[in-house]
Amino acid sequence: MAPPRNVVKIAVQMSDAIPQLIQLDQAKPLATVLKEVCDTWSLTHPEHYALQFADGHRKYITENNRSEIKNGSILCLSTAPDLKAQQLLSRLQNASREGCCEVLRNLVPLASDMTFAQEVISRDGLQKLSTIIENGDDLGEMLALGLRAFLELMEHGVVSWETLSISFVRKVVSYVNMNLMDASVQPLALRLLESVTLSSPTLGQLVKSEVPLDRLLVHLQVMNQQLQTKAMALLTALLQGASPAERKDMLDCLWKKNLRQFIYKNIIHSAAPMGDEMAHHLYVLQALTLGLLEPRMRTPLDPYSQEQREQLQALRQAAFEPDGESLGTGLSADRRRSLCVREFRKLGFSNSSPAQDLERVPPGLLALDNMLYFSRHAPSAYSRFVLENSSREDKHECPFARSSIQLTVLLCELLHVGEPCSETAQDFSPMFFSQDHSFHELFCVAIQLLNKTWKEMRATQEDFDKVMQVVREQLARTLALKPTSLELFRTKVNALTYGEVLRLRQTERLHQEGTLAPPILELREKLKPELMGLIRQQRLLRLCEGMLFRKISSRRRQDKLWFCCLSPNHKVLQYGDVEEGANPPTLESLTEQLPVADIRALLMGKDCPHVREKGSGKQNKDLYELAFSISYDHGEEEAYLNFIAPSKRDFYLWTDGLSALLGSTMGSEQTRLDLEQLLTMETKLRLLELENVPIPEHPPPVPPPPTNFNFCYDYSMTEP
């Protein structure tokens, strides 16, 4: 007879005792279960004990999380969290230095458990830890353990970072600013200051004033990836918390101190692989730097500004008066004005007054900045562009100003200028760190590409939008390759000629047209069930391989890893926490189990409980797109197993696999792409013998039936 649904068979162990094999009734109060376990071992005062998972993070079992106990789980009987917290804190207060280190070694692994953390915090544990950190009697292991325990407790979000004292923050800052410091202390101090900066504007200003940028640069130049990453994290946090004017001053200072060159040579081109966290911080640094262009992009040209009028005149003179000699010398004012209007027309402005062209935002004054940069840093290419096109009379001239304005808009869209930073993106461009003024330099390459493409297309003014579409495709395809330098970008984008773009488009079009013929569609429909079964099998295999996921804390930091996989028999999901940098665990080491039969539904995006309350701003979009949850039976209630996929592809593979596991339709974009690819290959294999044979749109007509079915055989014909 099968045991009731709410009964699980588990083992309970205790040091120096024979383990117990019991049937745990999940409907029975936990206090009653504890009393029964203690009675078996003849232990008094069961309220002084608690159950923990024996493996992994040794989480305390409470009424809220007892549903995580599955058949075969191994538990251990240990000291209750309130008593354990009291014991450790009492020893911490009166112990010697070595005794404090021993207490902290026991405290750190337990601090990640919410139940234990609440007990420590309620007994002023944070205050005791802050005293150890502020005293700084030991700048080695004890300080590192104290910082780690403090961070683990604060990450639960029970206490606000804004409650920290100024003296405490200053002491942590002093550890960052010290020259001779234990290698394990400074990354933890930097991590703490990053959390303070992101959570408290007031304390963030204190950190900004107390931590010199030069000191962060020193940490970045140490060949220690963990220290580099935490220093970059604090740097981007300070930049995000600064006002636009302060941010500009800080970035100008950093570029003058060769931060860009160091990132390019020692981080991007480092022999060691770059971590995800560092890639995210480089993306943030790139986005914040490009964000400095937003005010110019949002500001229209002021026709009454003397400075801006002089810039327009400088642009005209660089093209038509290269030697500084005015062609209008000796002419009347009206004649000179008429000459200027004509020359601005030759420059490619659509209106008689250039100010009218530059009133559009975006790109506003950023387009004028780009044109001036091109004229000053590539004067020969600028003059050749303008004079070559202004001298043509066959309507094939490429308007420089109009092209520059539209191209600036295009570059802002491709590089997401002015958009808020994503909290999870890692999509930075190595080329951005290869040289100064990268946006303007990119414009110089793009405007010459536009002129080249214009000639290849033999375009006229009516073809302007078509040319811009081709240039957008050329730039987008090349940026997607992530070239590491501007010269490499120039080489690749110039190799992608208009003819090559046409070839790519033609290939895609022929591919689409080939799959739209009715006989091909019929064949594809017959192949779909078999290929969908193949995709389903691949998705389930991917689940069996397992994957590392990151946990999101109360401040949505993705800094803890856990592993999840499907058992080979496809009946159980197994999961558990793992350490950063560790190899994926084996199935035997994963003690957490979720039977597939207990799963109710698969939730995605904003329906997930772990992102439902995060708001609806643009910064949450990436998080929503990567979030999914499994709801399952938790006694009579519903519980959730929450995921944040590392990438969009992994999100599709896992949600498809879970849908297949639950018997639902696999409806992701990745499934559609995989099915299309398999259908294309299989169709081509089936049609190999019909190469160069036209496939009719409709089947041949069936001939009419004969007038009668009286078949006749001529018996007069005899065989010889």
From Swiss-Prot:
<dbReference type="GO" id="GO:0048870">
    <property type="term" value="P:cell motility"/>
</dbReference>
<protein>
    <recommendedName>
        <fullName>Engulfment and cell motility protein 3</fullName>
    </recommendedName>
</protein>
<dbReference type="InterPro" id="IPR011989">
    <property type="entry name" value="ARM-like"/>
</dbReference>
<dbReference type="GO" id="GO:0007015">
    <property type="term" value="P:actin filament organization"/>
</dbReference>
<feature type="domain" description="ELMO">
    <location>
        <begin position="307"/>
        <end position="479"/>
    </location>
</feature>
<comment type="subunit">
    <text>Probably interacts directly with the SH3-domain of DOCK1 via its SH3-binding site. Part of a complex with DOCK1 and RAC1. Interacts with ADGRB3.</text>
</comment>
<dbReference type="Pfam" id="PF16457">
    <property type="entry name" value="PH_12"/>
</dbReference>
<dbReference type="InterPro" id="IPR016024">
    <property type="entry name" value="ARM-type_fold"/>
</dbReference>
<dbReference type="InterPro" id="IPR011993">
    <property type="entry name" value="PH-like_dom_sf"/>
</dbReference>
<dbReference type="InterPro" id="IPR006816">
    <property type="entry name" value="ELMO_dom"/>
</dbReference>
<dbReference type="InterPro" id="IPR001849">
    <property type="entry name" value="PH_domain"/>
</dbReference>
<keyword id="KW-0053">Apoptosis</keyword>
<keyword id="KW-0963">Cytoplasm</keyword>
<dbReference type="GO" id="GO:0005737">
    <property type="term" value="C:cytoplasm"/>
</dbReference>
<comment type="function">
    <text>Involved in cytoskeletal rearrangements required for phagocytosis of apoptotic cells and cell motility. Acts in association with DOCK1 and CRK. Was initially proposed to be required in complex with DOCK1 to activate Rac Rho small GTPases. May enhance the guanine nucleotide exchange factor (GEF) activity of DOCK1.</text>
</comment>
<dbReference type="InterPro" id="IPR024574">
    <property type="entry name" value="ELMO_ARM"/>
</dbReference>
<dbReference type="GO" id="GO:0006915">
    <property type="term" value="P:apoptotic process"/>
</dbReference>
<feature type="domain" description="PH">
    <location>
        <begin position="541"/>
        <end position="663"/>
    </location>
</feature>
<keyword id="KW-0729">SH3-binding</keyword>
<dbReference type="Pfam" id="PF04727">
    <property type="entry name" value="ELMO_CED12"/>
</dbReference>
<dbReference type="GO" id="GO:0006909">
    <property type="term" value="P:phagocytosis"/>
</dbReference>
<dbReference type="Pfam" id="PF11841">
    <property type="entry name" value="ELMO_ARM"/>
</dbReference>
<keyword id="KW-0581">Phagocytosis</keyword>
<dbReference type="GO" id="GO:0017124">
    <property type="term" value="F:SH3 domain binding"/>
</dbReference>
<dbReference type="InterPro" id="IPR050868">
    <property type="entry name" value="ELMO_domain-containing"/>
</dbReference>
